[in-house]
C-alpha cells in the first residue's frame, strides 16, 4: 500500500473546533445540529448538494465541528475560526441555544444523546457498543503542514513527547454524569477506549506507517487510514500532522495559545531534521505514563522528559518550553499567542471549572432554581463556559 502525502507548505496550519449546542438557560444539550447546519447552509447561499467545508456535523446531533481554511499565521487562523463560529453562534442564539466547549458535558446522560445518521458513524457505534455511545466529548484539533513526507513520522514522535503538555494545558473535563471524577481530563479516559484511539505507534519511516495501515485494513481493524484516531497522527490527504490530544477549549484566546505551541513545536522539529539531527523517541511506557499523569493531575503532573527517566514538574517544564520556543514564535509571527500559554497555566482548564462549581455550591440558588437541585452547580459550569465563548467571539475578554 502507498499513502501519497499531499503537497503542503511547511508550518501552515488549520484548526478544527468541536462545539456542543446547549440550552441557553438550562445548560442541557440540544440535539439540533442537523437543523442548525441546514439553516446555515441555506444562509450561506449553498445548493443542496454543495459541501460546506467550514461547518460540519459530528458523531452526535448535539455537536457541530468548525473548520478553518489553511493559514500561515496563528492570528489569521483564529480570526477565521472566530468568523465562522460567530455565524454559528448567532444562528444558534435565535433558537435559544449557546455554544459550549469543554472536554465533556458535566451532567448529561451520554447514552441518551442521538447520533448523526451516517454509515461511518453507524459502523463505529456497532463495533464499539457501550464505549462508543459514551463519546460525549469535545476537542480542538490542530493541523500543521510538512513540506517533506520524510519528516512526518519523526515529527509525530516528537509531538508524542509533548502530548502531556498540551493535554494538561487544555484539560477541561473533570466532571462526568454529575460526578467529579478526580481527573482533569475525563475525555482522555473515554476516547482511548476505542481500539484505534490513544497514542500512535512509533515509526521512523513513512513506509513503516504505510505497512501498518495496510495490515490494519487487511485484518479489518479499520476501513481506511482516517479511522486511525490517534492522539497525534499524520494526515496524508492534507500533507499535515494533526495534534488531537487537547480537550475542548472555550475561547479563541486559548485556542490561539495551543495552536501557537503546536505550530512552534512542529516547525522546531522540522528544522532540527533539516540540520540532520535525530528526534528523541520516548519509550512507549514513558509516553503512556505521561499521558495518564496529565489526564489525572493536569498542570500538577510530573512528566518523564527523556529515555533515562528524568522527571520534571510540568509546571516548570512547560514555561521553559515556551521560553525555548519564543525565537521560533517570533519568526512565525505568533509570539503573542504563544505567550498566552502562561495565562492558561495560571487559570485554565479543570481548576477553573472546579472553582465555578464551588462558588455555585457556596452561593444562593440562582433565580428560579431549587436549593436542592444537585445539577445546579454543574449547570453553572456549563453556562460559565458558554458565556466565555460568547464573550471571546464578541471580542471581549473570554
Swiss-Prot record:
Look up keyword Lipid metabolism and say if it applies: no
Q: What is its EC number?
A: 6.3.2.2
Q: Pfam families, per this entry?
A: GCS2
Signal sequence coordinates: none
Instruction: Tell me a GO biological process for this protein.
Output: modified amino acid biosynthetic process
Q: Which reaction does it catalyse?
A: L-cysteine + L-glutamate + ATP = gamma-L-glutamyl-L-cysteine + ADP + phosphate + H(+)
Which molecular function term from Gene Ontology is one that the record holds?
A: ATP binding
Family from the record:
Belongs to the glutamate--cysteine ligase type 2 family. YbdK subfamily.
Know the name of this protein?
Putative glutamate--cysteine ligase 2
Amino acid at each position: 500500500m502507498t499513502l501519497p502525502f499531499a503537497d503542503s507548505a511547511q508550518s501552515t496550519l488549520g484548526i478544527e473546533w468541536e462545539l456542543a449546542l446547549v440550552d441557553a438557560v438550562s445548560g442541557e444539550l440540544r440535539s439540533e445540529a442537523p437543523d442548525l447546519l441546514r439553516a446555515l447552509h441555506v444562509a450561506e447561499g449553498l445548493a443542496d448538494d454543495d459541501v460546506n467545508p467550514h461547518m460540519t456535523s459530528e458523531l452526535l446531533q448535539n455537536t457541530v465541528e468548525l473548520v478553518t481554511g489553511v493559514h500561515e499565521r496563528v492570528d489569521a487562523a483564529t480570526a477565521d475560526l472566530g468568523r465562522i463560529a460567530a455565524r454559528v453562534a448567532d444562528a444558534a442564539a435565535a433558537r435559544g441555544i449557546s455554544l459550549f466547549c469543554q472536554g465533556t458535558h458535566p451532567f448529561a446522560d451520554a447514552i441518551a444523546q442521538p447520533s448523526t445518521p451516517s454509515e461511518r458513524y453507524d459502523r463505529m457505534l456497532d463495533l464499539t457498543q457501550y464505549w462508543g455511545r459514551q463519546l460525549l466529548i469535545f476537542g480542538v484539533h490542530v493541523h500543521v503542514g510538512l513540506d517533506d513526507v520524510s519528516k512526518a513520522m519523526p515529527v509525530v514522535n516528537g509531538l508524542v513527547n509533548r502530548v502531556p503538555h498540551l493535554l494538561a494545558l487544555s484539560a477541561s473535563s473533570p466532571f462526568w454524569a454529575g460526578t467529579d471524577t478526580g481527573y482533569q481530563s475525563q475525555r482522555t479516559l473515554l476516547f482511548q477506549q476505542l481500539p484505534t484511539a490513544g497514542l500512535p505507534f512509533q515509526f521512523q519511516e513513512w513506509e513503516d506507517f504505510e505497512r501498518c495501515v495496510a495490515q490494519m485494513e487487511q485484518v479489518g481493524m479499520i476501513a481506511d487510514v482516517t479511522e486511525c484516531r490517534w492522539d497525534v497522527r499524520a494526515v496524508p490527504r492534507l500533507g499535515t500532522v494533526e495534534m488531537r490530544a487537547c480537550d475542548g477549549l472555550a475561547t479563541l484566546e486559548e485556542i490561539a495559545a495551543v495552536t501557537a505551541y503546536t505550530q512552534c513545536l512542529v516547525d522546531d522539529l522540522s528544522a532540527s531534521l533539516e540540520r540532520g539531527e535525530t528526534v528523541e523517541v520516548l519509550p512507549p511506557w514513558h509516553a503512556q505514563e505521561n499521558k495518564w499523569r496529565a489526564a489525572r493531575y493536569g498542570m500538577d503532573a510530573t512528566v518523564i522528559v527523556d529515555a533515562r527517566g528524568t522527571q520534571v514538574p510540568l509546571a516548570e517544564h512547560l514555561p521553559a518550553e515556551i521560553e525555548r520556543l519564543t525565537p521560533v514564535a517570533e519568526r512565525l509571527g505568533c509570539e503573542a499567542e504563544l505567550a498566552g500559554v502562561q495565562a492558561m497555566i495560571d487559570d485554565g482548564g479543570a481548576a477553573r471549572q472546579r472553582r465555578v462549581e464551588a462558588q455555585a455550591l457556596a452561593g444562593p440558588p440562582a433565580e428560579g432554581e431549587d436549593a436542592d437541585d444537585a445539577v445546579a452547580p454543574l449547570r453553572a459550569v456549563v453556562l460559565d463556559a458558554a458565556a466565555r465563548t460568547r464573550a471571546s467571539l464578541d471580542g471581549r475578554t473570554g
